[in-house]
């Protein structure tokens, strides 16, 4: 019954497309026979394999930045009193909901060559706004789009940490940064890696952002699309080979992540959740300003779309 239906759906929408993809990748466009020429062509020409290097580089940078931003935000949101916390969390979730190309389009309207902010700074202060095109633009858009994955994962994990562990560490003289590095981070590492995998997969597969603001910084999804729609008829097999390489890369990263998580994961039960503290003085002001600023910048794509 249900199991058979699930198997049919799984085979129809996952196994068959993957089988067709790899079959096409290993097929000679002219003879239709088995061939490795598509893969040889990819790795022989720098124009093609450079797109793989670019994809891996930008994806790694996006993932690293998302981990830093998302984990830091989750730490302060979980352990300190934040005014309008619920509203902040709603905005974080909303910033995650829109497609990445909306973010790229919005940043073009703001900071593109004829963008609102670009023209304002140029006409008022004669200041040339930094280009949002190329690697830097892709990094900006994808990081602001994807760090909420890390935040949501880590914020959930922070709630399951037992305060007894923190108190035990403090009684042994472990506090501040050392406490975070030696107690909290190891406890949430599996969760961080799970969120990082989501960020990595989304950044690697994203097509809209580099298509709109890449400008010469070629990445695999854009290259695959360009080859597939090429007017020359034999490019579909080559595009399939490039897609197969992406599948192999992402599958390898997935298995590596699962291996590391299985070695580092352990059950946690929060009998006494960690207490929320009230930060005071200038540090409290700085914390609120930075959190609000980050969320406001993350919401720019949605606000621009609404405004325009």
Language model features with spans:
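Helix-loop-helix hairpin linking two adjacent transmembrane segments in secondary transporters
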Residues: 225-249
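Short amphipathic alpha-helical coupling elements at transmembrane boundaries
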Residues: 27, 37-41, 89, 119-123, ...
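Glycine/proline-centered hinge or cleavage motifs at structural transition points of membrane proteins
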Residues: 172-174, 186
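Membrane-water interface segments at the C-terminal ends of transmembrane alpha-helices
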Residues: 1-29, 40, 44-159, 187-207, ...
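Glycine-rich helix-loop "coupling/hinge" segments at transmembrane-helix boundaries
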Residues: 109, 207-233
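Transmembrane helix boundary and interhelical loop/hinge segments in multi-pass membrane proteins
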Residues: 32-35, 154-167, 176, 204
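Short hydrophobic, aromatic-rich alpha-helical segments embedded in or entering the lipid bilayer
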Residues: 31-44, 215-227
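Alpha-helical transmembrane segments of integral membrane proteins
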Residues: 255-290
